[in-house]
Amino acid sequence: MASGQQQQGRSELDRMAREGQTVVPGGTGGKSLEAQENLAEGRSRGGQTRKEQMGEEGYREMGRKGGLSTGDESGGERAAREGIDIDESKYKTKS
């Protein structure tokens, strides 16, 4: 009985996704429930891979810079204007 309810719930989520709603966190742009699940998994895995390549410090520093960006200027421009130190040497990938 539980699997019938699960299937019904998935069908409802799929219908909503096909109508253009995002039903899976990170699944923005997917045209079906399965597509949104795949997008979310890929985005999560991509971020994890970058974190492993750059190391935790570099990944955190990159996030600081990205968080400073606005519609008018990049994070680097804003950091320079406001005198915020961003240590880009931490970005180097591990070899």
UniProtKB/Swiss-Prot annotation:
Residues 40-64, 75-95 have a biased composition (Basic and acidic residues). Induction: By abscisic acid (ABA). Residues 1-95 are annotated as: Disordered. Residues 1-10 have a biased composition (Polar residues). One of its GO terms (biological process) is response to abscisic acid. Expressed in dry seeds and immature embryos. Pfam families: LEA_5. It comes from the Eukaryota. The induction of Em proteins by abscisic acid may be mediated by the cis-element, termed the ABA-responsive element (ABRE), which binds a Leucine-zipper protein, Em bp1. Belongs to the small hydrophilic plant seed protein family. Em protein may act as a cytoplasm protectant during desiccation. This is Embryonic abundant protein 1. It comes from Oryza sativa subsp. japonica (Rice).
